[in-house]
C-alpha cells in the first residue's frame, strides 16, 4: 500500500478500442425487458429505502431482508389495508421482482385516501427494490409500469363553476 495513485496509473496497460469492443458496447438486445423470474441471476437481497406518492398520499418505505412481515404506521398489512384489492396492489412489486417473502416492510404513510395510500406504498416499494438491485428487478418493474409515478391529481375548482368542469344549468330564454 505504499504506491501512490499516480504510480498505479503509470503501471496500468492501455488497450486500444477494437471493432469487437464496439459491437459489445453498442449491442441492443431484441428483447430488453425481462419477465418476472427470467433474469439471468437471482435478485440481491439487501436493505433499501424510497418514497412513493399517489394523489395526496406520501409513503416513506424501508425494506429490510427478512421473512415478509409488514409494519405500516405500526400496524400489519391486513389491519391497515383490510381490502384484498389494496393488499394485492401493495404486494405486486415483490411478485413482479420475484422476491416474495424475502423482505420486511416498514412504512410511514400519510395523506390522501386508502387507494391513494396503497398506490403510494406500491411505488415506494418498487423504487426501493430498484435501488437495492437495479440489474435484476428494474426490467420487470419497468415493464409492469411500477416505477412510473401516476401524475393524475384532482383538478381544481374554477370560479363561476360548481365543480372543476360542471357548469350551472344554462337557460336559453
Swiss-Prot record:
Pfam short name (any one): Ribosomal_S9
Chain intervals with Polar residues compositional bias: 1-15
UniProt entry keywords in alphabetical sequence: Ribonucleoprotein, Ribosomal protein
GO biological process: translation
SUPFAM superfamilies per UniProt: Ribosomal protein S5 domain 2-like
Start-end of Basic residues biased regions: 154-173
Region (Disordered) location: 1-26, 135-173
Single Gene Ontology MF annotation: RNA binding
GO terms for cellular component: cytoplasm; small ribosomal subunit
HAMAP family: Ribosomal_uS9_B (MF_00532_B)
Family, per entry: Belongs to the universal ribosomal protein uS9 family.
Protein name: Small ribosomal subunit protein uS9
